[in-house]
């Protein structure tokens, strides 16, 4: 009897310990699940919160950029009215200037509006803009020339930037309306065309009034100043004072040579050009350094060079300077 009691007590003790351990494991699982759920909810909340903050910052930046652009365009910026804009299609404009202008509200109202009926079109009709079929009772705008029909909202949005049919590309306006529209556009561009014609006339006058130089004279300079090789030698003529009405200052040096001394003049012009190039090279510090390096390297191999400079006493130089 005592042995039976001991076995029963040991069995009940084992059952109680198993129940306790199972309860502990269950509570631990529940606590872990709640912790994971709490972290997940906190993560979602933080993500939504920061997403809203980012959206607000982006909207503020966009508003600031729009305000800056408006201030740049006009000194007095109009009051900014924030409105919720509807999404719309953006169509690429064509090459024709008339098709890019679009239709006015008066021209849109002149186009007929019909209510779609299933009896009139057994096969069904599809709007080529929104790619959806017309249902019974839908408002459709019928184009008079090509007899194509579309939803009123779709075709009105298309006609904001176009004046042709989106399928066949035929003009919706008649020839009289299109010609009147072109005539309205011509006066706007008349002033610009006048200014461009005036500019072309001025350029042609400048090109015709440009001085002509002989072929044996070296000429260089800018648009408002013309000079030749010997700018320091010459005399001013009193007879050239009558041509001082021109606005641009011009200094011209002409080398007048005889037929017997053409070869001498060619050599003198080349020597004068060489002298000018040498003067320009002497002014730059890079050339002086190279020259000193050359002298240092060739100090043992110096060879006497004789520079022949021919001066022609028979050639006479005339300098004509025209002041404004």
Curated annotation (Swiss-Prot):
In Gene Ontology terms, what is one molecular function of this protein? transferase activity
Where is region (Disordered) located?
A: 179-210, 226-248, 299-324
Report the sequence similarity comment from the record. Belongs to the RING-type zinc finger family. ATL subfamily.
Q: Give the boundaries of each RING-type zinc finger.
A: 127-169
Short name of any one Pfam family annotated for the protein: zf-RING_2
As its record notes, the protein acts as a catalyst of: S-ubiquitinyl-[E2 ubiquitin-conjugating enzyme]-L-cysteine + [acceptor protein]-L-lysine = [E2 ubiquitin-conjugating enzyme]-L-cysteine + N(6)-ubiquitinyl-[acceptor protein]-L-lysine
GO cellular component term of the entry, any: membrane
The record's listing under CDD domains reads: RING-H2_EL5-like (cd16461)
Q: Which domain of life is it from?
A: Eukaryota
- E.C. number(s) listed in UniProt: 2.3.2.27
Please name the taxonomic classification of the source: Eukaryota, Viridiplantae, Streptophyta, Embryophyta, Tracheophyta
Free-text note on domains in this protein's UniProt record: The RING-type zinc finger domain mediates binding to an E2 ubiquitin-conjugating enzyme.
Stretches of Low complexity bias are at 306-324
Localization in the cell: Membrane
Keyword entries, A-Z: Membrane, Metal-binding, Transferase, Transmembrane, Transmembrane helix, Ubl conjugation pathway, Zinc, Zinc-finger
- Gene Ontology BP term (one): protein ubiquitination
As recorded in Swiss-Prot or TrEMBL, the protein's gene is named: ATL3
Q: Spans of biased composition, class Polar residues?
A: 192-210, 226-235
**Pathway listed:** Protein modification; protein ubiquitination
Leading EC class: transferase
Membrane-spanning regions, if any? Answer: 24-44
The name of this protein is RING-H2 finger protein ATL3
């Amino acid at each position: 009897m005592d042995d039976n009691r001991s076995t029963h007590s040991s069995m009940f003790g084992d059952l109680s310990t198993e129940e306790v351990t199972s309860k502990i494991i269950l509570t631990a699982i529940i606590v872990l699940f709640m912790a994971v759920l709490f972290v997940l909810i906190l993560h979602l909340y933080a993500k939504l919160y920061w997403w809203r903050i980012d959206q607000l910052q982006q909207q503020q930046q966009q508003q600031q950029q729009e305000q800056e652009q408006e201030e740049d365009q006009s000194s007095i910026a109009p009051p900014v009215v924030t409105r919720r804009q509807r999404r719309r299609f953006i169509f690429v404009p064509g090459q024709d200037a008339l098709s890019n202008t679009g239709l006015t509200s008066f021209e849109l109202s002149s186009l007929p509006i019909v209510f779609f009926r299933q009896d009139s079109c057994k096969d069904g009709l599809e709007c080529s803009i929104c790619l959806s079929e017309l249902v019974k009772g839908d408002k459709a705008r019928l184009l008079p020339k090509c007899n194509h029909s579309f939803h009123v909202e779709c075709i009105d949005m298309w006609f904001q930037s176009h004046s042709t049919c989106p399928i066949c590309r035929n003009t919706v306006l008649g020839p009289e309306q299109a010609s009147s529209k072109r005539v309205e556009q011509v006066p706007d561009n008349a002033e610009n065309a006048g200014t461009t014609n005036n500019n072309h006339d001025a350029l042609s006058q400048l090109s015709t009034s440009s001085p002509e130089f002989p072929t044996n004279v070296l000429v260089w300079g800018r648009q408002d100043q013309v000079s030749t090789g010997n700018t320091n030698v010459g005399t001013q003529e009193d007879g050239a004072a009558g041509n001082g009405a021109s606005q641009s200052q011009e200094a011209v040096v002409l080398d007048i040579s005889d037929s017997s001394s053409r070869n001498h003049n060619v050599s003198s012009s080349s020597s004068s050009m060489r002298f000018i190039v040498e003067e320009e090279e002497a002014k730059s510090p890079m050339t002086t350094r190279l020259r000193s390096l050359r002298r240092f390297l060739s100090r043992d191999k110096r060879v006497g060079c004789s520079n022949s400079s021919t001066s022609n006493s028979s050639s006479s130089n005339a300098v004509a300077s025209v002041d404004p």
